[in-house]
Curated annotation (Swiss-Prot):
Cited HAMAP family: AstB
GO molecular-function terms, A-Z: N-succinylarginine dihydrolase activity
Source organism, top-level taxon: Bacteria
Pathway: Amino-acid degradation; L-arginine degradation via AST pathway; L-glutamate and succinate from L-arginine: step 2/5
Primary enzyme class: hydrolase
Any GO BP: arginine catabolic process to succinate
Species of provenance: Salmonella typhimurium (strain LT2 / SGSC1412 / ATCC 700720)
Protein name: N-succinylarginine dihydrolase
PANTHER family in the record: N-SUCCINYLARGININE DIHYDROLASE (PTHR30420:SF2)
Binding-site list for substrate: 19-28, 110, 137-138, 212, 250, 359
Length: 447
């Protein structure tokens, strides 16, 4: 059956700021307390979406979350009206305010893990929401992510959206950022590669930075998504690269159809994995980048592998890269050599995503890949599909509501909270989502 990959990109939220919340993500730590530009950030993402849609790659959007997220502060014991809570937290515990204001839901590669219908035992598209257990600011995301995905993939005859795994470290799940699918045509059965950083009773794990994904979580997600057990491989990421800042597998590897593009040090027991894939994926090709050409540290600094690898209609592939790759002499030299060689990657497209990149999120972080047949695509909420009208509407919406300068101190401004809620109210109508946010369901601005 004919199917296409649709990229669902996250819209950057109104409270996009640099707080250094993500230990193990070196860009996040390095840019802590810098001044952000939320309006520029959302527009950089929109430009990427529109350019790819115009080039013929199906593209859709996933909205941001409600931030600052007052219900989480109430859970932490802060009381009073929403405005009083903001004031108390800003004075007493500003780090909590930064955490509940994080715009991290924009990195929708962590929203869920997707199983196309061709791989599922019941023939439906499955999406299991990630619990993002390793970081408090990200663990807040799962309930609203689930509501958003149900509002987008609302036809239960075609789609199954599963709640996140229990919020315990044993089942830490980071979603599609630790998942690749390899195979031939998108509509044919593929091989799903789940990548984990740790498992119980396995002493091979990083020493400096946390391994966020457990094998136990990956196995549970594969079961929930009804992936045919004959089509699954579980592989461990190299703990040494996690300790160098590779906090998700999509910082060191990316796949598309029969191609796996990765660093030579990406996986533990990499030769064994490559041989497995060669046996199970027809026409499999591994493009392993030697450390002598691109070091792991340069790969992390430029997000070379946090790129999108997209299939063009002529059968060749386009590599979508952040501008940091072009700015790095060694990485850019390697890439130009790569596209000149005999392999499916024949072209590159560079985007300026510096607002997201400074928080540790490149092109691949910003998108969730969903393979859909034509019938399934028609069943997706049509209001989220990128086109000229939606691009124009979202830019006007961003101009109206987004600030062009934001610091951690600004998060306590009650006006920012009101601006955000008004913006999301408008957005849910624009995207035909219904009342997906807690503030819409309570019907009150103050608690």
């Amino acid at each position: 059956m004919t199917a296409h990959e649709v990229n669902f990109d996250g819209l950057v939220g109104l409270t996009h700021h640099y707080a250094g919340l993500s230990f193990g993500n070196e860009a996040s730590t390095r840019h802590r307390f810098q001044v952000s530009n939320p309006r520029l950030a959302v527009k950089q993402g929109l430009l990427k979406m529109k350019a790819l849609a115009d080039a013929g790659f199906p593209q859709a959007v996933i909205p941001p979350h409600e931030r600052p997220f007052i219900p989480a502060l109430r859970q932490l014991g802060f009381t009073g009206s929403d405005e009083q809570i903001l004031d108390k937290v800003a004075r007493q515990a500003p780090r909590w305010l930064s955490s509940v204001s994080s715009a991290s839901p924009m990195w929708v590669a962590n929203a869920a893990t997707v199983c196309p219908s061709a791989d599922a035992l019941d023939g439906k598209v499955h999406l299991t929401v990630a619990n993002l257990n390793n970081k408090f600011h990200r663990a807040l995301e799962a309930p609203v992510t689930e509501a958003l995905l149900r509002a987008i993939f609302r036809d239960e005859s075609q789609f199954s959206v599963h709640s996140a795994l229990p919020q315990v470290a044993l089942l830490g799940d980071e979603g599609a950022a630790n998942h690749n699918r390899l195979g031939g045509e998108y509509g044919s059965a593929g091989v799903q590669l789940f990548v984990y950083g740790r498992e119980e009773e396995n002493e091979i794990r990083p020493a400096r930075y946390p391994a966020r994904q457990s094998r136990e979580a990956s196995e549970a997600v594969a079961r929930l998504n009804q992936v045919n057990p004959q089509q699954v491989i579980f592989a461990q990421q190299n703990p040494e690269v996690i300790d160098q800042g590779v906090f998700h597998n999509d910082v060191i590897a990316v796949s598309n159809r029969q191609v796996l593009f990765c660093h030579e040090a990406a996986f533990a027991r990499q030769k064994v994995l490559i041989n497995q894939l060669r046996t199970r994926v027809d026409g499999f090709m591994a493009i392993e980048v030697p450390a002598g050409e691109v070091s792991v540290s340069d790969a992390v600094a430029t997000y070379l592998f946090n790129s999108q690898l997209l299939s063009r209609n002529d059968g060749l592939m386009l590599l979508v890269l952040p501008r940091e790759c072009q700015d790095h002499v060694g990485v850019w030299r390697y890439l130009n050599k790569l596209v000149a060689e005999d392999n499916p990657i024949s072209a590159m497209q560079v985007f300026d995503l510096r607002e997201s990149m400074a928080n540790g999120g490149g092109p691949a972080c910003l998108r969730l890949r969903v393979v859909l047949t034509e019938e399934e695509r028609r069943a997706v909420n049509p209001a989220v599909m990128m086109n000229d009208a939606l691009f124009t509407a979202l830019n006007a919406w961003a101009d109206r509501y987004y600030r062009d300068r934001l610091t951690a101190a600004d998060l306590a401004d009650p006006l920012l909270l009101r601006e955000g809620r008004e913006a999301l109210d408008v957005l849910t109508r624009l995207l035909d989502l219904g009342s997906v946010y807690p503030f819409q369901q309570t019907g009150a601005a103050d608690g």
